[in-house]
Amino acid sequence: MNVGKLQPVRGTRDLLPEECYKFWHIRDVAHDIGERYGFVPVETPIFEFQDVFLKTLGDSSDIIGKEMYSFPDRGGDVLVLRPELTAAVARMLICERLTLPARLFTFGPVFRYERPQKCRQRQFHQINYEHFGAGCTADAELMALAYDILGALNLRSEVQLEINSLGNQDSVLEYRNSLLKYFEKHEHALSEDSRRRLQTNPLRILDSKDRGDIAILCGAPVIADFYDDESKMTFNGVMQQLDNLGIPYTVNPRLVRGLDYYCGTVFEFKTTSLGSQDAVIAGGRYDKLVASMGGGDVPAVGFAGGVERLASLAAYSHSTRFSVAFLPLGEEAARCAMRSAYELRGRGIRVLCDGVVEKLKIGLKHADRSGVDLALILGDEEIAKGEVLCRHMDTGLQQTVSISNLGDYVSGMESNAQGNNRAALSSAGE
């Protein structure tokens, strides 16, 4: 096989143990905090019918325009690898006739055909929260949830919350027309992408990272000038709730989201540490999404967090569990080790047991590299006496224990190790 074909596909990568542990830590933190806010876990398929996204994300979005992985199946349907989770979860809400209000949490990979760069791959992972049937008071609550996640990951000092409101449909339409007139005057200076967006959705130009576009944006109208009284009151209410919760924020009048289903409040937690990929958590309100999919009028708000981006910012060191390794020095010892390992695993102990060890010195080196706490040595002499030689890997001290008492001995060692870890954590927190 061609060696090049053994490499991960461009825009994807392998996750080795330490990074997997960090991903799982972020997932577990997100799930735990989500549960405190009443969110329950769900999962959707990795691939969906293309229409799930064509009818919801908007023709002007980059995802629809050039980033979806689509393919025909053998039945003639066009399927896509999910490029985001919100529309997929909304489809599930309708299909499964879930009771409202519904607070749903998802975690998993999504796929976009983008130019790979730091923290931006073609396969990446998201934590995702959707609150269907949510009134406007839920906007601040979702931002509080995200703020709590960042706090649990010790990232609050790394990010800044930016918020804005897109108002209602009338204000967006008026603002769109005003932007169109403004950008048409500067069309010759816009980037190629922005000239394309000018014909489809000029609001998307506000999200441009092109330096020339950014200079033009300085003089562009802002949407706040087009709010009606209700939109002003709603957005002021969101800001008052954030103030009441003590969550710092900045109003960014040019903040929009990249998908057409957003309306009302939008927000992003941004960092300056990741270059152009500055949004680590982002979301907003999408009151018309479910209706656009044929599911009725369901107000909703949600957000997604990029796991790769959070992982690149978060400091995390996986604490290995207490573990032991059997080092049997013969076939009979290997059979005894296998039985004992099975019993220890039944007690919840992490056990490595790889068969006969030809040389004890090499076996001890392997045990040390594996990071185990105890090496359990079984030779002919130990088998004859019904004993195990327990070597403490940190000190080198050795102790003989009867095979019949091995379970209690190792369980006691594990309990002591857990107690020491808790004491160390408590001391570090003082």
Curated annotation (Swiss-Prot):
Catalytic activity reported: tRNA(His) + L-histidine + ATP = L-histidyl-tRNA(His) + AMP + diphosphate + H(+)
InterPro entries cross-referenced by the UniProt entry: aa-tRNA-synth_II, aa-tRNA-synth_II/BPL/LPL, Anticodon-bd, Anticodon-bd_dom_sf, His-tRNA-ligase, HisRS-like_core, HisRS/HisZ
CDD domains: HisRS-like_core
MF term (GO), any: ATP binding
Localization (cell): Cytoplasm
EC id: 6.1.1.21
PROSITE patterns: AA_TRNA_LIGASE_II
Keyword Aminoacyl-tRNA synthetase: yes
GO CC terms in record: cytoplasm
Principal location class: cytoplasm
Ligase among keywords: yes
GO BP annotations listed: histidyl-tRNA aminoacylation
UniProt keyword terms in alphabetical order: Aminoacyl-tRNA synthetase, ATP-binding, Cytoplasm, Ligase, Nucleotide-binding, Protein biosynthesis
Membership in a protein family: Belongs to the class-II aminoacyl-tRNA synthetase family.
Quaternary structure and interacting proteins, as annotated: Homodimer.
Official protein name in the record: Histidine--tRNA ligase
